């Protein structure tokens, strides 16, 4: 069935009222483009941010939506006002599926098209909530979410493997350069490496 995002999810507008000491703080700079995982944040108590989020909330970078910044919060904390906190309505949308609805090209294209402002365009929830998409029944949503999270885990593992491979190749390459720099050549003895 086709639904609007606002029918199955809502913007959370809660503010942090407690002590801020040690509370994670998320700004736009902490949201990596195209990534579902939130891997960096600050732990400052001196922030002016007041918007709060819960573990499992989707944090959407509403300023410059073309940067494709959205991630799942792995903890509760405080975030910038330029982040829209989105939460699933569990009776309509499986919370584990929401990140994949937000972190996709169709949604970002819609958000960019609805953004207002020239230097720093921002998308508002009132517009984002009108994003339409096809949504299966809850039972099928579970299967789909499991499949998408498994694919995401495989993608993350692949990225780590590529980074490790790149590091290994670079260290081997640089090791050869170091040995060559310490080498000397003589007509009788050929190439010799300094000890």
Give the label of every model feature segment:
Residues 20-22, 80, 95, 128:
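A structure-centric signal for secondary-structure junctions around beta-strands
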Residues 1-18, 130-146, 153-195:
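Non-catalytic DNA-recognition/assembly elements of restriction-modification systems
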Residues 6-55, 192-195:
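Sequence-specific dsDNA recognition surfaces
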Residues 50-51, 58-103:
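A short beta-sheet element
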Residues 63, 77-84, 117-139:
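A short glycine-rich beta-alpha junction/loop motif
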């Amino acid at each position: 069935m086709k639904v609007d995002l606002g029918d199955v999810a809502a913007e959370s507008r809660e503010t942090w009222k407690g002590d801020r000491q040690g509370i994670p703080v998320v700004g736009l700079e902490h949201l990596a483009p195209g990534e579902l995982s939130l891997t960096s944040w600050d732990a400052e108590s001196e922030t002016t941010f007041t918007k709060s989020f819960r573990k499992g909330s989707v944090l959407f970078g509403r300023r410059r939506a073309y940067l494709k910044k959205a991630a799942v919060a792995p903890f509760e904390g405080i975030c910038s006002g330029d982040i829209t906190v989105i939460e699933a309505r569990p009776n309509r949308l499986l919370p584990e599926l929401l990140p994949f609805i937000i972190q996709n090209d169709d949604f970002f294209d819609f958000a960019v098209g609805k953004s207002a402002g020239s230097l720093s365009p921002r998308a508002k929830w009132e517009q984002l909530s009108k994003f339409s998409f096809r949504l299966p029944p809850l039972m099928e949503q579970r299967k789909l979410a499991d499949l998408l999270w498994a694919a995401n885990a495989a993608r993350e593992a692949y990225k780590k493997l590529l980074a490790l491979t790149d590091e290994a190749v670079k260290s081997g390459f640089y090791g050869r350069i170091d040995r060559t720099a310490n080498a000397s050549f003589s007509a009788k003895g050929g190439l010799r490496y300094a000890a």
